[in-house]
């Protein structure tokens, strides 16, 4: 029962923070440092990523279907936009893996996320659409996504800000952000599977508990994603800065003691 409760806690955090601009990686690192080895299971990481990936596929299935049928140029934009995260992600994972588990860095980057959200709230609305985005602009949005490899930097907040700076309107900046998330989450899942195979252990968590975790992450993710879309249309995403900055300051202060 204790393991089930811990998995459900992680699934809820993953489902909320994967989509709302508050950084799932940062919160999981901080939560793991508070509660011990809560977030260290590679198998659980794969399962929770699969749950939130399912949320994206459900919410954006019409856009994804359109990409496969007629908007194939956008697939090229997504490939270009994914390259920075691949290069930087592999570099950090292989050369500096310790920073991905640093609660101090996660706290500091939560503050940066809060500042980015404040900047986002001050931008003048534009009318660009993601299907008209240039290759260079897609690459730059991808650089914003690569920045979010650091724990505490929100992937959604960073890429939505990048899209808005490239001239996208509110809806399309959100849509492009989460279309970019599909290869990013798939890539993270593949790396996690690779680590799992090299480690040779799937952990002690039962299939039933893992299934519940995936279902919780999936359901919470759908709610969080729809919440983000609604608040983006209402220009409220900067409100999350009031969580990120105080939380980040608190984590930094606690880890500097």
UniProtKB/Swiss-Prot annotation:
Record-level GO cellular component terms: plasma membrane
Enzyme class: hydrolase
Topology with respect to the bilayer: Multi-pass membrane protein
Keyword Repressor included in the entry's annotation: no
Transmembrane segments: 4-24, 41-61, 74-94, 103-123, 133-153, 173-193, 209-229, 236-256
Keyword Cell membrane: yes
Disulfide bond positions: none
Single GO molecular function: undecaprenyl-diphosphatase activity
GO biological process per UniProt: cell wall organization; peptidoglycan biosynthetic process; peptidoglycan metabolic process; regulation of cell shape; response to antibiotic
Main location: membrane
Catalytic activity from the UniProt record: di-trans,octa-cis-undecaprenyl diphosphate + H2O = di-trans,octa-cis-undecaprenyl phosphate + phosphate + H(+)
Annotated EC: 3.6.1.27
Pfam families, per the entry: BacA (PF02673)
Source organism superkingdom: Bacteria
Keywords assigned: Antibiotic resistance, Cell inner membrane, Cell membrane, Cell shape, Cell wall biogenesis/degradation, Hydrolase, Membrane, Peptidoglycan synthesis, Transmembrane, Transmembrane helix
Cellular location(s): Cell inner membrane
Annotated function: Catalyzes the dephosphorylation of undecaprenyl diphosphate (UPP). Confers resistance to bacitracin.
Family designation: Belongs to the UppP family.
Note: Bacitracin is thought to be involved in the inhibition of peptidoglycan synthesis by sequestering undecaprenyl diphosphate, thereby reducing the pool of lipid carrier available.
Protein name: Undecaprenyl-diphosphatase
Species: Rhodopirellula baltica (strain DSM 10527 / NCIMB 13988 / SH1)
Gene symbol of the encoding locus: uppP
């Amino acid at each position: 029962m204790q393991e089930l409760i811990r998995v459900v806690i992680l699934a809820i955090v993953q489902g909320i923070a994967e989509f709302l601009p508050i950084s799932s990686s940062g919160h999981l690192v901080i939560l793991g440092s508070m509660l011990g080895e809560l977030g260290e299971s590679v198998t659980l990481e794969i399962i929770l990523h699969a749950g939130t990936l399912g949320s994206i596929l459900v919410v954006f299935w019409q856009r994804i279907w359109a990409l496969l049928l007629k908007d194939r140029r956008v697939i090229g934009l997504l490939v270009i936009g994914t390259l920075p995260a691949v290069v930087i992600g592999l570099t950090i994972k292989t050369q500096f893996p310790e920073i991905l588990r640093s609660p101090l860095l996660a706290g500091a980057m939560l503050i940066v996320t809060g500042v980015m959200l404040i900047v986002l709230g001050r931008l003048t609305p534009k009318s660009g659409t993601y299907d008209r985005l240039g290759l260079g602009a897609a690459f730059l949005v991808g650089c914003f996504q690569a920045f979010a490899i650091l724990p505490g930097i929100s992937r959604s907040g960073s890429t939505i800000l990048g899209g808005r700076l490239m001239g996208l309107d509110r809806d399309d900046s959100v849509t492009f952000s989460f279309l970019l998330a599909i290869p990013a989450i798939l890539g993270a899942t593949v790396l996690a599977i690779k680590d799992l195979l090299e480690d040779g252990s799937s952990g002690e968590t039962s299939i039933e508990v893992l299934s519940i975790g995936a279902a919780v992450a999936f359901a919470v993710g759908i709610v969080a994603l729809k919440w983000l879309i609604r608040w983006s249309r209402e220009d409220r995403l900067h409100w999350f800065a009031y969580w990120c900055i105080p939380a980040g300051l608190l984590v930094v202060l606690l880890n500097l003691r």
